[in-house]
Amino acid sequence: DRRLLARIHHYTIRRLRAEIEPVAARDFLRFLFAWHHVTEDTRLEGPDSLTVAVASLEGFEAPAGAWETEILPLRIKAYEPSWLDEQCLAGRISWARLTPSASGNGPVRTTPIALMERRRAVNWMTLAGADGAPQPGPRAQTVFDVLKAQGALFFDELTEMSGLLRQQVEEALGELVSLGLVNSDSFGGLRALLVPAAKRKPP
């Protein structure tokens, strides 16, 4: 019967539309807050929870200085910076700049970086690419050439091999981070660059 088939079709379409009906904005926001663990009853705890927080933010870039002052503490109770270092050194989490930089002159603190699971870091870096990034300045280029030739180095080794002063090496590393050309195994290396040497209080 044609009328019966039409009714079945109409009922099916109506049911399918109901299943994909948009929710109210407040319900969507409630879902987002829970998904990102920023409500009191969904906040995470402990160092191992970092991988959960990072997974929900993977690929998202934020100012380097905001990760440990705002983003992670909002999601993880009693967050400790050492937790991120431990997860990075254990090979679980990595950090990098993904978007090309217009210049490397901006402060490291405001440089957009992303946290990601280390096992997927190559995928993110491949997607980002380094096309369009400006050339580093002379000192930054010197440091970059040393790292390219020697691989990962301790700061004192890098200072000695580059022939630059410690502050010059710090500034060069900051420029290379801002350009997205270098990163480190630990977040501690980036953390050390967030406050320029010239603005640090003496011990």
Task: Identify what each model region corresponds to.
Residues 1-203:
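Long, charged, low-complexity, helical-prone intrinsically disordered regions
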